[in-house]
């Protein structure tokens, strides 16, 4: 009886994951037997399932360890899971009209999104290297198929192949790093690895293990120098799937990196008063990502490739907070990723809303004179672009404020200064789009917006515009989540 009670208590901890897994199996059956309208039926039920899972996490918070620390359920994991679920939910909402018009409205699409989301939830709660890899691969395999799901489109097929090949390489790097750490410590748990290494001189093999693990994880957030897949996949994949790639997987991967760093690497003492190896790697990736995001996007005219480089830059700014290695830094990342998700949803809703009678907008110069033909869209996107450029009092400004403040508090003043300079440079290409929309001569008018696009645009614009008034609410929850990670 006692054992049964303990098993039930353990299963309650992962109830959201169980709900998603059961939902996937049920939706597969529904999709097969619902005939011609299977796509809309399954998509609607998937959106309802994601919303129900968010409600479950919010109303019934549970803390604990599942199966000897394989999964860790705490305030941090709940916060990041909610963000991930919101990202998946809005991606599906945005996909409805696009999928129908582009003739790939197949019921497997929302189910693959659910499979990827389940993998992300496992990643976020990972407590050891085994659960880390299982969650990561469940997410990755679903994402490879999603990238190439538009089989009649050459660019989509090319994006899927590129993502698969480079993703397999990153998985190999990650596995090799895990094997090195396991070989030198005999442990797979994050905290156990830290305990085994702490106080001892780090062997060269351990340092290589740390490097390979961080390299494999950096691929998932498109951090330089593991960003090569991002522009091509963003451009080639269908736009709603690009919106999904830009949001939920980045949040889950960042959560995983945070947990690995905080549990396994931060407790390690650096020798000879020198900066720890993990911190050197993070600083290099942060500066490189911020620099590439600032300079590479300047020459881009394809709007999805531009958003790809923008995303790389944003991950660099988030890594600034992680390099600080303290509670304030993790809190800054949580706030940054919250704001980043809001801006991403709004930006891709705009891209999906900008459609001519025969095609979607691909070039930023197609937006010329938008304020004259569609003032609502011009105003909403201007708000988003000001936020992406981190111009106060928009939400994007506060995201960078928290991460740079954490870096300064940790003594990484040069890193914060470099970040601020690159942020100013990166604002150029956002302001260029505003100039095109407001001051260039108008082109052809666009088709009427669908209701789901209007909903996403309005919610996102209100979020980034009025964050200054209710941001303290997110700050409070982010602080609780960050604190739970260091306990």
Swiss-Prot record:
Protein name: NADH-quinone oxidoreductase subunit N
Membrane topology: Multi-pass membrane protein
GO molecular function: NADH dehydrogenase (ubiquinone) activity; NADH:ubiquinone reductase (non-electrogenic) activity; quinone binding
Chief location of this protein within or outside the cell: membrane
Keyword set, alphabetical order: Cell inner membrane, Cell membrane, Membrane, NAD, Quinone, Translocase, Transmembrane, Transmembrane helix, Transport, Ubiquinone
BP-aspect Gene Ontology terms: ATP synthesis coupled electron transport
Annotated InterPro entries: NADH-Q_OxRdtase_suN/2 (IPR010096), ND/Mrp_TM (IPR001750)
Assigned GO CC terms: plasma membrane
Homology family: Belongs to the complex I subunit 2 family.
Reactions catalysed: a quinone + NADH + 5 H(+)(in) = a quinol + NAD(+) + 4 H(+)(out)
Protein EC: 7.1.1.-
Quaternary assembly: NDH-1 is composed of 14 different subunits. Subunits NuoA, H, J, K, L, M, N constitute the membrane sector of the complex.
Organism whose genome encodes this protein: Bartonella bacilliformis (strain ATCC 35685 / KC583 / Herrer 020/F12,63)
Function: NDH-1 shuttles electrons from NADH, via FMN and iron-sulfur (Fe-S) centers, to quinones in the respiratory chain. The immediate electron acceptor for the enzyme in this species is believed to be ubiquinone. Couples the redox reaction to proton translocation (for every two electrons transferred, four hydrogen ions are translocated across the cytoplasmic membrane), and thus conserves the redox energy in a proton gradient.
Compartmental location: Cell inner membrane
Source species, domain of life: Bacteria
Transmembrane annotation, as ranges: 12-32, 40-60, 79-99, 104-124, 129-149, 164-184, 201-221, 248-268, 281-301, 310-330, 332-352, 378-398, 411-431, 455-475
HAMAP family: NDH1_NuoN_1
């Amino acid at each position: 009886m006692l054992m049964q009670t303990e098993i039930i208590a353990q299963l309650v901890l992962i109830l959201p994951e169980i709900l998603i897994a059961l939902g996937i199996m049920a939706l597969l059956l529904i999709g097969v037997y619902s005939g011609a309208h299977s796509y809309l039926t399954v998509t609607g039920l998937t959106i309802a399932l994601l919303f129900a899972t968010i409600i479950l996490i919010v109303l019934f918070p549970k803390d604990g360890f599942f199966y000897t620390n394989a999964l860790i359920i705490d305030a941090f994991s709940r916060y990041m899971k909610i963000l991930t679920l919101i990202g998946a939910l809005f991606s599906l909402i945005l996909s409805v009209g696009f999928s129908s018009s582009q003739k790939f409205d197949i019921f497997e699409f929302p189910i693959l999104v659910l499979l990827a989301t389940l993998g992300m939830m496992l990643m976020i709660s990972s407590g050891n290297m085994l659960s880390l890899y299982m969650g990561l691969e469940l997410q990755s395999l679903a994402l490879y198929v999603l990238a190439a799901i538009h089989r009649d489109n050459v660019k989509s097929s090319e994006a899927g192949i590129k993502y698969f090949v480079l993703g397999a390489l990153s998985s190999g790097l990650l596995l090799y790093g895990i094997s090195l750490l396991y070989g030198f410590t005999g442990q797979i748990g994050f905290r156990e690895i830290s305990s085994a290494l702490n106080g001892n001189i780090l062997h060269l093999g351990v340092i290589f293990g740390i490097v390979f693990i961080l390299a494999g994880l950096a691929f998932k957030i498109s951090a330089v120098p593991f960003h090569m897949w991002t522009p091509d996949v963003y451009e080639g994949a269908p736009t709603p799937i690009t919106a999904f790639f830009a949001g939920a997987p980045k949040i889950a991967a960042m959560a995983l990196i945070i947990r690995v760093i905080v549990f396994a690497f931060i407790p390690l003492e650096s020798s000879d008063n020198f900066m720890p190896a993990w911190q050197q790697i993070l600083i290099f990736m942060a500066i490189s990502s911020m620099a590439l995001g600032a300079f590479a996007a300047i020459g881009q005219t394809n709007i999805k490739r531009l958003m790809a480089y923008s995303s790389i830059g944003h991950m660099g700014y988030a890594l600034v907070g992680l390099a600080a290695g303290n509670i304030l830094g993790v809190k800054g990342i949580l706030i940054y990723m919250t704001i980043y998700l809001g801006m991403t949803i709004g930006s891709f809703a705009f891209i999906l809303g900008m459609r001519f009678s025969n095609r979607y907008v691909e070039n930023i110069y197609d937006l010329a004179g938008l304020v004259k033909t569609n003032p609502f869209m011009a105003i909403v996107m201007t708000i988003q672009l000001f936020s992406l450029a981190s111009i106060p009092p928009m939400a994007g400004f506060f995201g960078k404020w928290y991460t740079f403040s954490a870096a300064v508090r940790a003594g990484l003043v040069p890193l914060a200064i470099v970040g601020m300079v690159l942020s100013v440079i990166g604002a150029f290409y956002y302001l260029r789009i505003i100039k095109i929309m407001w001051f260039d001569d108008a082109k052809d008018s666009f088709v009427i917006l669908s209701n789901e696009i209007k909903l996403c645009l309005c919610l996102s614009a209100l979020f980034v515009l009025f964050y200054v008034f209710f941001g303290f609410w997110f700050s409070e929850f982010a602080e609780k989540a960050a604190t739970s990670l260091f306990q």
